[in-house]
Amino acid sequence: MKIYKLQTPVNAILENIAADKSISHRFAIFSLLTQEENKAQNYLLAQDTLNTLEIIKNLGAKIEQKDSCVKIIPPKEILSPNCILDCGNSGTAMRLMIGFLAGISGFFVLSGDKYLNNRPMRRISKPLTQIGARIYGRNEANLAPLCIEGQKLKAFNFKSEISSAQVKTAMILSAFRADNVCTFSEISLSRNHSENMLKAMKAPIRVSNDDLSLEINPLKKPLKAQNIIIPNDPSSAFYFVLAAIILPKSQIILKNILLNPTRIEAYKILQKMGAKLEMTITQNDFETIGEIRVESSKLNGIEVKDNIAWLIDEAPALAIAFALAKGKSSLINAKELRVKESDRIAVMVENLKLCGVEARELDDGFEIEGGCELKSSKIKSYGDHRIAMSFAILGLLCGIEIDDSDCIKTSFPNFIEILSNLGARIDY
């Protein structure tokens, strides 16, 4: 895919960007904890979340889909399927399903694409094995394909060494099948969509006052079925916010955006850098929803070291903002970036250098010198959708060719369409 330099300003109101991926995954998987029909409007129709629907279908769920409206009727009992459960490129789907299936009677095989099958799963499989789960795979169940032989699980008191919503949710799902009350704690608050959704479903969980600890009781009855409208994904919206900031005389309004406090840290960083950006809450139901207004802005360099778990998906796009800011910027305490869909630290630095930007790898992040003269280049996405989309936005300023852009479809299938509607010229 080739993005050409955009010569005109962007002025738009965007109402139909991609639905939130985290909530879409959880809606599908959590429906298996109910016994009645679950409904979602604005379900994300991307490869990752469609794979999750196929997984729960193979476990016995019945699914009706009309456009982005999805109905799920869970099975009375989870089936032990005669096929591999394909998670595609989604670490969320795989890690949550490991936790869900560990305590379910049956035999299950989880696999994914070549990128997912090289991402670490021991952070889930190890604590589950310690409470009685039987999980088999390469490198001591660290790499998929993974085979799970469901067992009755023992109660646990688990303290996670990393701040990860995927680890937290996997442990919550396993706790529902344990033989007694379980507790989970983390060093800092990760995304809390699971807690929000499960509380709305009347799940037997209790969150501590500081939000860092959970008490989870075994399920004694099915949870309340869901009927929700899924808001738009702030991680997807971030690319167009960045576009409005870096393109002269531009303004964008994005509506129906998820504004959960654990999802807007990157927006707050842009504000600290000088971005003319406003977030307005319009709805507070099981999640906080609102709109974002942003316009062309001059950015200043910044050091980012806190709340990294809240901006891990936006980090590649933030690196683009760093490259266009005045002065030096840095991101640290972000070692988790090395085990995402790609090694995002190495890949961002490599590709920024190709575009004429001074950038340096750190063990747990990167340093970027802003204000360098940009040059058109061909970059490698390494199959990482967030790398591809971040450099597509930079391409609006200098022209960029991306070797593999098909990966964008895993999370944001209409990204190219929206970019084209904003005036971008794209050879695809």
Swiss-Prot record:
EC number: 2.5.1.19
GO molecular function: 3-phosphoshikimate 1-carboxyvinyltransferase activity
Binding site for 3-phosphoshikimate: 21-22, 26, 164, 166, 313, 340
Cited PROSITE patterns: EPSP_SYNTHASE_1, EPSP_SYNTHASE_2
Catalytic activity: 3-phosphoshikimate + phosphoenolpyruvate = 5-O-(1-carboxyvinyl)-3-phosphoshikimate + phosphate
Gene Ontology biological-process annotations: amino acid biosynthetic process; aromatic amino acid family biosynthetic process; chorismate biosynthetic process
Active site residues of this protein: 313 (proton acceptor)
Swiss-Prot/TrEMBL keywords: Amino-acid biosynthesis, Aromatic amino acid biosynthesis, Cytoplasm, Transferase
Cellular compartment(s): Cytoplasm
Record: residues binding phosphoenolpyruvate: 21, 91, 119, 166, 344, 386
Enzyme class per UniProt: transferase
InterPro entries noted in UniProt: Enolpyruvate_Tfrase_dom, Enolpyruvate_Tfrase_sf, EPSP_synthase, EPSP_synthase_CS, RNA3'P_cycl/enolpyr_Trfase_a/b
GO cellular component: cytoplasm
Pathway(s) per entry: Metabolic intermediate biosynthesis; chorismate biosynthesis; chorismate from D-erythrose 4-phosphate and phosphoenolpyruvate: step 6/7
Protein role: Catalyzes the transfer of the enolpyruvyl moiety of phosphoenolpyruvate (PEP) to the 5-hydroxyl of shikimate-3-phosphate (S3P) to produce enolpyruvyl shikimate-3-phosphate and inorganic phosphate.
Complex and partners: Monomer.
NCBIfam families reported for this sequence: aroA (TIGR01356)
Family stated for the protein in its record: Belongs to the EPSP synthase family.
Name this protein carries in UniProt: 3-phosphoshikimate 1-carboxyvinyltransferase
Organism of origin: Campylobacter jejuni subsp. jejuni serotype O:23/36 (strain 81-176)
